[in-house]
Amino acid sequence: MAKVIYNVTLSVSEEVHEPWLAWMKGSHIPDVLGTGCFEWAKLLRVHAFEQGGLTYAVMYCAATMEDYERYVSAHSGRLQAEHEALYKDTVVAFRTMLEVLHEFSPKIN
């Protein structure tokens, strides 16, 4: 079974950057992982030449498509609504689901 990466890219305005980042690390990402639908999450800073904000990506790994679909049907609406209620006009999110076709690692001889 193929793993699934649920990627959320977020453009965050500078005025809410610090409290948003603290909330993501201390509340939102742990809540998403607490659903039991994902094996791990990674928070990344996107380095791009943009004006008026900072860009982040959060990658969540689901072991199966069924786990991802369970997250979408049972949990995503509530968790996205919480984010929207706090950061409606200051954070824009773009979501993508990626199917892992193959994993590579360096060969160690």
Residue ranges of predicted features:
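Short, well-ordered beta-strand segments in beta-rich or mixed alpha/beta enzyme
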Residues: 4-11, 41-74
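A contiguous, mid-protein "functional segment" used to position or interact
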Residues: 61, 78, 92
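A short, structured loop/turn motif at beta-sheet edges
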Residues: 33-35, 63, 103-107
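Glycine-rich beta-strand-turn "strand-cap" elements at beta-sheet edges
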Residues: 42-52, 82-109
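Short amphipathic alpha-helical segments
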Residues: 16-42, 80-81
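Anionic, Ser/Thr-rich low-complexity intrinsically disordered regions
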Residues: 2-4, 38, 108
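Short amphipathic alpha-helices in soluble, non-transmembrane regions
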Residues: 22, 70-79
